[in-house]
């Protein structure tokens, strides 16, 4: 029965499918917001109205893309679908909690959208800094609704993280050690630990903001002995691990895709890859104040956060060069998924290089809150996380659906998207270096040319998104079924057929120990 299967589901595959569909839908909303932003900035002068509505759109774009697109698809969608299959578990450790994790997201999304409907909306940027987010600058219920939305999304992610950690540690076959797990499983494990440790800090920060707004506390109000910089510390102690949460599952997926389409039986430097992910996870927690170089920290504090941030480049470099070494000498198959993975490696590396630039506190003082920062994090998110999602989706689509995509269309779509995102975000480096600030709906005429180019790129990306929807429709309409996958011996998620049965294992999987 429909309601029993989809509303009360305790099946990891069905919940994963729900996450993928929800993430795709939210992705459309987030894309619409981004198109509105670029339409406003396409030429000087005003298009939508004042800066408040513009900033509401910018804030919503960030929240929707982060909490309702990337995290549900990567962790909820791919994680739920693949983790049990990859470790030979019958399902997740807590199947009903898994269902609740998903169903907390639509109400959360509803609250976020509602926040833009009351008063003037939440025009604070996704960081929600007080005093702008306080009850003077943002009177009314907007920010409160946004805070409740974040609370629900946070609870969802924390429960999900507990579920994944328990599943991965506890539900492997006895003969399978930590170091027999596929890299995607490792990436989700590290991601879940990061979520579990960082989200409670965000919850504390936004709850204090909520009481500051409604109960007359003064956590962030200097008049009552509070400090707005405390909020920044709490927010970024969550916010920096969060950006690694968004990219780590992508690392895992890219490792699988690169290995598969290079015809290799394993990625180069498995242990190095695992330790690199754990190092990135650890270091991600001790660099948060590099987002706050401009609030007036001591020179020695700035020196520490600069050098600690640069250290993250080392494990990241280990991963990039291990991917290249995996490619080396392989029988490379130029499938669309491989193209996405190679695009990921190239563009993520560019984003990493601009990250190294911004790690220097002296440079960041000048570049902070300019479009250089926007360009940097969109290179690692819009071309890192999104490219990984696209590659993973195309690679595992036959597993999820039992049908194959049209590879010609998929390659065309990759090309269109590649041109679109680069035309959108590469010029923003120049805008930032010329001093164009973020979060403004208008700009001096001197910035017109690069902004126009950037906005053209966003419309090309929109065409690519529409092409992807068409490709999925075409696959389900044509019903080209999968007969056999290659390299199944080293890619265990494919072993039970495409798609796998509703209940993968009627009895525990037997894994022979090599030791």
Swiss-Prot record:
<feature type="topological domain" description="Mitochondrial matrix">
    <location>
        <begin position="262"/>
        <end position="269"/>
    </location>
</feature>
<keyword id="KW-0479">Metal-binding</keyword>
<feature type="binding site">
    <location>
        <position position="45"/>
    </location>
    <ligand>
        <name>Na(+)</name>
    </ligand>
</feature>
<feature type="transmembrane region" description="Helical; Name=IV">
    <location>
        <begin position="141"/>
        <end position="170"/>
    </location>
</feature>
<feature type="transmembrane region" description="Helical; Name=XII">
    <location>
        <begin position="447"/>
        <end position="478"/>
    </location>
</feature>
<keyword id="KW-0408">Iron</keyword>
<dbReference type="GO" id="GO:0005743">
    <property type="term" value="C:mitochondrial inner membrane"/>
</dbReference>
<keyword id="KW-0812">Transmembrane</keyword>
<feature type="binding site" description="axial binding residue">
    <location>
        <position position="61"/>
    </location>
    <ligand>
        <name>Fe(II)-heme a</name>
    </ligand>
</feature>
<feature type="transmembrane region" description="Helical; Name=VI">
    <location>
        <begin position="228"/>
        <end position="261"/>
    </location>
</feature>
<dbReference type="InterPro" id="IPR033944">
    <property type="entry name" value="Cyt_c_oxase_su1_dom"/>
</dbReference>
<keyword id="KW-0106">Calcium</keyword>
<protein>
    <recommendedName>
        <fullName>Cytochrome c oxidase subunit 1</fullName>
        <ecNumber>7.1.1.9</ecNumber>
    </recommendedName>
</protein>
<dbReference type="InterPro" id="IPR023615">
    <property type="entry name" value="Cyt_c_Oxase_su1_BS"/>
</dbReference>
<keyword id="KW-1278">Translocase</keyword>
<feature type="topological domain" description="Mitochondrial intermembrane">
    <location>
        <begin position="287"/>
        <end position="298"/>
    </location>
</feature>
<feature type="topological domain" description="Mitochondrial matrix">
    <location>
        <begin position="87"/>
        <end position="94"/>
    </location>
</feature>
<comment type="pathway">
    <text>Energy metabolism; oxidative phosphorylation.</text>
</comment>
<feature type="binding site">
    <location>
        <position position="369"/>
    </location>
    <ligand>
        <name>Mg(2+)</name>
    </ligand>
</feature>
<feature type="transmembrane region" description="Helical; Name=IX">
    <location>
        <begin position="336"/>
        <end position="357"/>
    </location>
</feature>
<feature type="topological domain" description="Mitochondrial matrix">
    <location>
        <begin position="171"/>
        <end position="182"/>
    </location>
</feature>
<feature type="topological domain" description="Mitochondrial matrix">
    <location>
        <begin position="401"/>
        <end position="406"/>
    </location>
</feature>
<feature type="binding site">
    <location>
        <position position="441"/>
    </location>
    <ligand>
        <name>Na(+)</name>
    </ligand>
</feature>
<feature type="binding site" description="axial binding residue">
    <location>
        <position position="376"/>
    </location>
    <ligand>
        <name>heme a3</name>
    </ligand>
</feature>
<feature type="binding site">
    <location>
        <position position="244"/>
    </location>
    <ligand>
        <name>O2</name>
    </ligand>
</feature>
<feature type="transmembrane region" description="Helical; Name=VII">
    <location>
        <begin position="270"/>
        <end position="286"/>
    </location>
</feature>
<feature type="topological domain" description="Mitochondrial intermembrane">
    <location>
        <begin position="213"/>
        <end position="227"/>
    </location>
</feature>
<keyword id="KW-0472">Membrane</keyword>
<feature type="binding site">
    <location>
        <position position="240"/>
    </location>
    <ligand>
        <name>Cu cation</name>
    </ligand>
</feature>
<feature type="cross-link" description="1'-histidyl-3'-tyrosine (His-Tyr)">
    <location>
        <begin position="240"/>
        <end position="244"/>
    </location>
</feature>
<dbReference type="InterPro" id="IPR036927">
    <property type="entry name" value="Cyt_c_oxase-like_su1_sf"/>
</dbReference>
<keyword id="KW-0915">Sodium</keyword>
<feature type="topological domain" description="Mitochondrial intermembrane">
    <location>
        <begin position="434"/>
        <end position="446"/>
    </location>
</feature>
<dbReference type="InterPro" id="IPR000883">
    <property type="entry name" value="Cyt_C_Oxase_1"/>
</dbReference>
<feature type="transmembrane region" description="Helical; Name=X">
    <location>
        <begin position="371"/>
        <end position="400"/>
    </location>
</feature>
<feature type="binding site">
    <location>
        <position position="40"/>
    </location>
    <ligand>
        <name>Na(+)</name>
    </ligand>
</feature>
<comment type="similarity">
    <text>Belongs to the heme-copper respiratory oxidase family.</text>
</comment>
<feature type="topological domain" description="Mitochondrial matrix">
    <location>
        <begin position="328"/>
        <end position="335"/>
    </location>
</feature>
<feature type="binding site" description="axial binding residue">
    <location>
        <position position="378"/>
    </location>
    <ligand>
        <name>Fe(II)-heme a</name>
    </ligand>
</feature>
<comment type="subunit">
    <text>Component of the cytochrome c oxidase (complex IV, CIV), a multisubunit enzyme composed of 14 subunits. The complex is composed of a catalytic core of 3 subunits MT-CO1, MT-CO2 and MT-CO3, encoded in the mitochondrial DNA, and 11 supernumerary subunits COX4I, COX5A, COX5B, COX6A, COX6B, COX6C, COX7A, COX7B, COX7C, COX8 and NDUFA4, which are encoded in the nuclear genome.</text>
</comment>
<dbReference type="Pfam" id="PF00115">
    <property type="entry name" value="COX1"/>
</dbReference>
<feature type="topological domain" description="Mitochondrial intermembrane">
    <location>
        <begin position="358"/>
        <end position="370"/>
    </location>
</feature>
């Amino acid at each position: 029965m429909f309601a029993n299967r989809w509303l009360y589901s305790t099946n990891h595959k069905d919940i994963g499918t729900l996450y993928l569909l929800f993430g795709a839908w939210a992705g459309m909303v987030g894309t619409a917001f981004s198109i509105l932003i670029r339409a406003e900035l396409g030429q000087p002068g005003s298009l939508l109205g004042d800066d408040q509505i513009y900033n509401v759109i910018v804030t919503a774009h960030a929240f929707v893309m982060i909490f309702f697109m990337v995290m549900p698809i990567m962790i909820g969608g791919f994680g739920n679908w693949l983790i049990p299959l990859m470790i030979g578990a019958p399902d997740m450790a807590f199947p009903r909690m898994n269902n609740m994790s998903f169903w907390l997201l639509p109400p959360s999304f509803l609250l976020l959208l509602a926040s833009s409907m009351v008063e003037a909306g939440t025009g604070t940027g996704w960081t929600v800094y007080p005093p702008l987010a306080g009850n003077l600058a943002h009177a009314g219920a907007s920010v409160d609704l946004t805070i409740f939305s974040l609370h629900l999304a946070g609870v969802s992610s924390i429960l999900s993280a507990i579920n994944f950690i328990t599943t991965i540690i506890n539900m492997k076959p006895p003969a399978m050690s930590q170091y027999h797990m596929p890299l995607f499983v490792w990436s989700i494990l590290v991601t879940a630990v990061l979520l579990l440790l960082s989200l409670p800090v965000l919850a504390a920060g936004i709850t204090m903001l909520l009481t500051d707004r409604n109960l007359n506390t003064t956590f962030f109000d200097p008049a009552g002995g509070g400090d707005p910089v405390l909020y920044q510390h709490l927010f970024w102690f969550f916010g920096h691990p969060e950006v690694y949460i968004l990219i780590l599952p992508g690392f895992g997926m890219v490792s699988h895709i690169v290995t598969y389409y290079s015809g290799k039986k394993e990625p180069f430097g498995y242990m190095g890859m695992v330790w690199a992910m754990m190092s990135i996870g650890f270091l991600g927690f001790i660099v948060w104040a590099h987002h706050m170089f401009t609030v007036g920290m001591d020179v020695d504090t700035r020196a520490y956060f600069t050098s600690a941030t640069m250290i993250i480049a080392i494990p990241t470099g280990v991963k990039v060069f291990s991917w290249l070494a995996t490619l080396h000498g392989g029988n490379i198959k130029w499938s669309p998924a491989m193209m996405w993975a190679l695009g990921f490696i190239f563009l993520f590396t560019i984003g990493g290089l601009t990250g190294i630039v911004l790690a220097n506190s002296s440079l960041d003082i000048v570049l902070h809150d300019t479009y250089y920062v926007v360009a940097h994090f969109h290179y690692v998110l819009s071309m890192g996380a999104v490219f990984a999602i696209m590659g993973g989706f195309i690679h595992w689509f036959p597993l999820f659906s039992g049908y194959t995509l049209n590879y010609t269309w998929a390659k065309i779509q990759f090309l269109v998207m590649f041109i679109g995102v680069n035309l959108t975000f590469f010029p923003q480096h120049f805008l930032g270096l010329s001093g164009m600030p973020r979060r403004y709906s208008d700009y001096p005429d001197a910035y017109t040319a690069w902004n126009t180019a950037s906005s053209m790129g966003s419309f090309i990306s929109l065409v690519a998104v529409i092409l992807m929807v068409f490709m999925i429709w075409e696959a389900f309409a044509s019903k080209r079924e999968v007969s056999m996958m290659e390299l199944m011996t080293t890619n265990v998620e494919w072993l039970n057929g495409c798609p796998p049965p509703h209940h993968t294992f009627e009895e525990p999987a037997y894994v022979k120990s090599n030791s």
